[in-house]
Amino acid sequence: MKRGELYRVAHPSGRAPKRSRVFVIVSRQILVESRFSTVTCAPVYSVNEGLSTQVPVGIEEGLKHDSSIHCDELVSLPKTVLTNFVGTLSPRKLNALNTSLKIALEIND
C-alpha cells in the first residue's frame, strides 16, 4: 500500500448512492506504513468541474473512464477496506495531486 495508489471501496458510506467508490491514498508514506489503522484518502468522481482542487485521472490510472480526484473532500478510511487495487498515479499526476492538496488546504510555500 502506497501514497498515490487508487483503490475501489465497497459501500464507502451509508449515504453514498453508489455501491462503490474509488479513493486515492494521500497520507504520507511513513503513516501508511505505520501501526495506525487509517489513512487519509481523496475520493474520485466522474465529474470534473475544472477546479484547481481537482486532478484529472482516467484510463492511464486504471479507471474505466475520465474522472477526477477531489481534494476538497478528504476522508479517513480504515486500511482494511483498501483491498481492491485499481492503479497508481504517475509521478506527474502525483505532483498535480500535491499542488491541488496545497490549494485545498491553503498551504503556502
Label every PLM stretch briefly.
Residues 1-109:
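Conserved functional hotspots at enzyme active or ligand-binding sites that engage polyanionic ligands
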